Amino acid sequence: MPSISMMSDAITPETLKKEKKMKSETLDSDDTVVKKEKSSSKKKEKSSSSGKKDKEEKEKKKKRKAVDLDDSSDKSDNSSELVQADDLKPKKAKVMEEAVVEAEDPNSLSNFRISKPLKDVLISKGIKALFPIQAMTFDNVIDGCDLVGRARTGQGKTLAFVLPIVESLVNGRTKDLRRSGHGRLPSVLVLLPTRELATQVLADFQVYGGAVGLTACSVYGGAPFHSQISSLTRGVDIVVGTPGRVKDLLEKGVLKLGSLLFRVLDEADEMLKMGFVDDVELILGKVDHVSKVQTLLFSATLPSWVKQISTRFLKSAKKTVDLVSDQKMKASISVRHIVIPCSASARPDLIPDIIRCYGSGGRSIIFTETKESASQLAGLLTGARPLHGDIQQTQREVTLKGFRTGKFMTLVATNVAARGLDINDVQLIIQCEPPRDVEDYIHRSGRTGRAGNTGVAVMLYDPKRSSVTKIERESGVKFEHLSAPQPVDVAKAVGIEAAAAILQISDSVIPAFKDAAEELLSTSGLSAVDILSKALAKAAGYSDIKERSLLTGMEGYVTLLLDAGRPFYGQSFAYTVLKRFLPATKADSIMGVALTADKSGAVFDVPVDDLETFLVGAENAAGVNLDVVKALPPLEEKVQISRRFGGGGRGGRGGGYGGRGGGYGGGGYGGGGGYGGRGGGYGRR
């Protein structure tokens, strides 16, 4: 089958710039003709000196895209000359500068057929220029072309169809075709994979469509039928929904597509992954007058099913706008990608420190692989809320609203939110383990660094079961390999914040605490600096600071590197070497053994209390070096195999991470499921 780009006119950023440049040159040419005509009439009424001045002013007008700088109150009775640039007020000069900047940006709103009401809404939201995917698709949609649009996640694909569809319905070619009045059939149908995404796309249609008198509703499972049926019965212009509920409403005869002008498939690749293939094909096939319907397909990736859909249901003259193409880099380039080794049991203690180090005080989303682990982890983290498919839709909407408004700053979610969330100011993404599919990593990490912002994506991984290299290779990202934040480093950062907070306290408290402070200073035997350090620690919530493993992130452990002067071909060799100079019980107590990438040694964790025993023992062993690791060396990765999920699925009968016969096998991530202890996935065996 030929590729989409071969069957249609592919559009690139370079061709768009050329078109914009040609349009700009044409406008300049037209302006010159008009200006010459005006200049001719003026010359008949002016002296030679004023004619010279008019000629100079005409050149300045041309450079400024004919921005009208006249001020009628400043004109003389017998002159129509423009005010000279030297006489401009600062306010006018600023307007002139902004106009020049706007003219230089090919994606400026002024370069597109956007009506004033919509332009006003965009400007009110701080949008003065379209994103590349929006700019490159706008004219095609307005002109009635079927279209396939592909861009990296977080690059504004939603507005790429919302804006031109709304403009077309009220001012464009479909204006006279759109139905009106009570009970009208919808003109637009948007299909997408999740309820969360439906809610957000609806919100965009309500903002932009509402500004020009259009109405919209969303239909999805988990919400009552009667309210959705009521909306459709009253009549709407735009319907946004998930395939399952749209199919149900079509079969009930409540949703009718007889007046459809636009059909949109948003996140088409995700609908494939979620098993909506049959439903999507059935819905698309329900449209009879296909020649009158414009079809738009947007996707971050183009798997074979998406290509087949575009061939079957889009017109042969369709356009393709591909901002990814064959580029290797598919993950967001505005995101800092970090990987940190961490065992499952260490996550609840480590994640808060990761948020402190990389969250910058903003919103954070934590992704887990199961619903159970999302709920359990949210319960262990202060100020966090879970979001997954088992939560009632009304509660999910309340949760999302609270997250957007800053009522709480940490969301723990399953993949249900990976494509559905479109919140521009998420600062940090944490993935508790490498996802099974590389595309999942791309979409999860793409929840930050959106709409021109930057962000951080941290992925935790077990060094013994890692697919980091595979994700790095296939997504095109370059991971920063970092160790778990050490409690002492986190405490230093928190201490700076606590010190700044102390300076904000009113001096009125000093008399009340001064006597106690002086007594403490005179009797404690500590210096003033030491006492103040302890006070800052208390204010920051610290009573002590523990060591943390660089290998697994577990508190109370330290990571060692073993070098025996010969290659390590298996983990068992590390135990053999250790038993030469340590009691068997001590050797067997080590945790998280992993070989270095060059097989020259092995790293593992030991309890802090046993550190001295290990180091002294190694000093008395010939040909053995044992050192405390300051930074992890590159480690050997082991490919994960599909049967790792055992007979119990992702957690087996025990649930969570691990489980009897499931999870990572026999409680590999701990016991019988859940978080902690013998019954918890985040507990040790």
Curated annotation (Swiss-Prot):
Q: Where in the cell is it found?
A: Nucleus
Any keyword Repressor?
no
| UniProt-recorded name of the protein | DEAD-box ATP-dependent RNA helicase 7
Spans of biased composition, class Basic and acidic residues? 22-42, 66-78
Hey, which family's this protein in? Belongs to the DEAD box helicase family. DDX21/DDX50 subfamily.
Q: Which gene encodes it?
A: RH7
- Gene source species: Spinacia oleracea
Where is this chain primarily localised? nucleus
Q: Where is this motif: DEAD box?
A: 266-269
